[in-house]
């Protein structure tokens, strides 16, 4: 807008805030500060405000002055060399035992390697993350007519028709039992009958006539041998004449059949006993449970705390071509990172990243010869996490058991081997800590990284904002001057 206030004199109003300095894209300024996230103790090149936000997060009240200086320089077309100062920040981890992983080199040296998952950089932002590891997992979810007595994960079971597998999980509110089948090609239907684990529990016995000697008088507890089951414990009462008057069940065991004959050894029948006692299994419980309905586990299982099903990560993993060619099964695994709170993405339950069709085998390769091992790929490609420790809560894929642990090379396997299953393995990260208030020593240590002219090219040293006291501000300013003088460029 222009106005003429006197003859021949014109005033023009011009916005200079968006002026771009010619040649500014070749100018680089150095800045050290505290940030919401990002690597600590290393120089990071930044070319735009978008780049700054993606790498170091959004500004806070505590670092607003430094942030303004950075954004203004970038706004005029310049570039930045940024160092995040090391303050009392910590990385969030899968078990909540926070550690400080300064940068990728720090992690590669072993810092944080005991954790299954660690947030890529320090700060409370990592407390929003949930890491989901999922493989082929369970096969089906059975809705049972009643709750089985045994619902412990990894417990072997069969149907009355002989379909075998292991229990993965049980929801007592709905009587839904997730199961892993030994033969996934033969699915359970609602016409099958669930043969409850723990069948053959003894509740009553009879015993053969027995007369010993008076010194056997008393109560004697024994775990008899024989029969089709195990775990039975009985108590025999012998009177003053050495006669067995009763035998009662103390622990029913499992797997017994009515009519089984078991033996209480003489050694368990008191002083002077010379004969064994014969006991017959009289009553056992064999509760079979009707199956009301059946559905697929993978497509109907939700990630805890979200409405996302596992299908939001990717199709069900199975066995890679590499493993299959060696007779090995169930090596594939997906890894996904979920924003549980929305603090990272702006929307809760957002899938921040998904890395699919990885392998549990250390030497697995793609068709192009690249590594497929899940730890290698996650540590190389993920923007949000590192992984190194061991996943817990793994389950057997077959009733026979004996599946193999993650993290082995193919040479450790024989044809027919299977990997243990992670199924749905969730890790909510916690323990991350922010600290925006840096001391002169902390920010000065960060500025020292700009002193090497060979490692960092810069045209300016930006002081940023003032500190909490005049003396601290002066110390910060003097450090900027000292670094500039040392560089002499």
Segments (PLM) and residue ranges:
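Extended assembly-interface regions of large multimeric machines
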Residues: 1-203, 284-343
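Short, glycine-/Ser/Thr-/acidic-enriched flexible segments
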Residues: 122, 254, 269, 342, ...
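Residues embedded in well-ordered beta-strands within globular domains across many folds
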Residues: 248, 378, 461-462
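A glycine-rich, acidic short-motif signal
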Residues: 336-338, 355-361, 421-489
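Long, low-complexity, polar/charged, intrinsically disordered or flexibly structured peripheral segments
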Residues: 284-319, 378-446
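E2/UBC-UEV (E2-variant) core
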Residues: 347-397
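Short loop/turn motifs at secondary-structure junctions
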Residues: 201, 243, 329, 455-457
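Conserved, function-critical positions that sit in or immediately flank catalytic
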Residues: 149-292
């Amino acid at each position: 807008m222009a106005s003429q206030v006197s003859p021949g004199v014109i005033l023009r109003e011009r916005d200079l805030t968006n002026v771009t300095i010619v040649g500014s894209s070749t100018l680089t300024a150095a800045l050290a500060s505290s940030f919401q996230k990002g690597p600590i103790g290393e120089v990071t090149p930044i070319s735009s405000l978008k780049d700054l936000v993606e790498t170091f997060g959004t500004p806070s009240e505590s670092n607003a002055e430094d942030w303004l200086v950075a954004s203004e320089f970038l706004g005029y077309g310049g570039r930045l060399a940024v160092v995040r100062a090391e303050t009392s920040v910590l990385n969030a981890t899968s078990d909540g035992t926070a550690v400080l992983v300064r940068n990728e080199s720090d992690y590669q040296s072993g810092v944080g390697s005991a954790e299954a998952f660690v947030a890529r950089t320090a700060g409370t932002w990592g407390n929003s993350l949930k890491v989901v590891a999922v493989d082929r997992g369970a096969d089906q979810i059975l809705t049972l007519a009643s709750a089985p007595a045994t619902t412990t994960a990894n417990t072997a079971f069969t149907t009355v028709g002989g379909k075998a597998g292991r229990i993965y999980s049980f929801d007592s509110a709905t009587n839904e039992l997730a199961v892993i089948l030994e033969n996934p090609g033969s699915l359970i239907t609602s016409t099958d009958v669930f043969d409850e684990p723990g069948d053959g529990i003894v509740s009553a016995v009879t015993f053969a006539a027995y007369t010993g000697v008076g010194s056997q008088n008393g109560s004697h507890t024994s775990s008899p041998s024989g029969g089709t089951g195990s775990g039975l414990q009985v108590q025999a009462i012998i009177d003053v004449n050495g006669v067995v008057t009763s035998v009662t069940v103390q622990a029913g065991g499992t797997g017994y059949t009515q009519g089984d004959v078991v033996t209480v050894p003489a050694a368990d029948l008191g002083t002077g006993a010379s004969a064994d006692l014969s006991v017959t299994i009289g009553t056992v419980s064999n509760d079979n449970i009707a199956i009301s309905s059946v559905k697929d586990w993978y497509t109907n299982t939700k990630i805890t705390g979200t409405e996302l099903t596992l299908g939001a990560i990717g199709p069900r993993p199975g066995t890679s071509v590499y493993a299959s060619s060696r007779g090995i099964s169930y090596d594939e695994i997906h890894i996904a990172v979920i924003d549980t709170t929305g603090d990272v993405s702006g929307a809760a339950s957002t899938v921040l990243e998904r890395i699919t069709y990885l392998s549990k085998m250390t030497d697995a390769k793609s068709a192009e010869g690249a590594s497929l091992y899940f730890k290698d790929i996650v540590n190389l490609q993920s923007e949000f996490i590192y992984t190194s420790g061991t996943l817990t809560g793994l389950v057997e894929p077959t009733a026979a058991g004996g599946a193999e642990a993650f993290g082995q090379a193919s040479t450790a396997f024989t044809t027919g081997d299977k990997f243990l299953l992670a199924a749905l393995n969730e890790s909510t990260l916690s323990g991350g800590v922010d600290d925006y208030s840096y001391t002169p020593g902390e920010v000065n240590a960060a500025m020292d990284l700009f002193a090497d002219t060979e490692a960092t090219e810069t045209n300016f040293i930006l002081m940023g904002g003032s500190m909490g006291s005049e003396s601290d501000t002066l110390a910060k300013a003097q450090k900027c001057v000292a670094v500039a003088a040392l560089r002499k460029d």
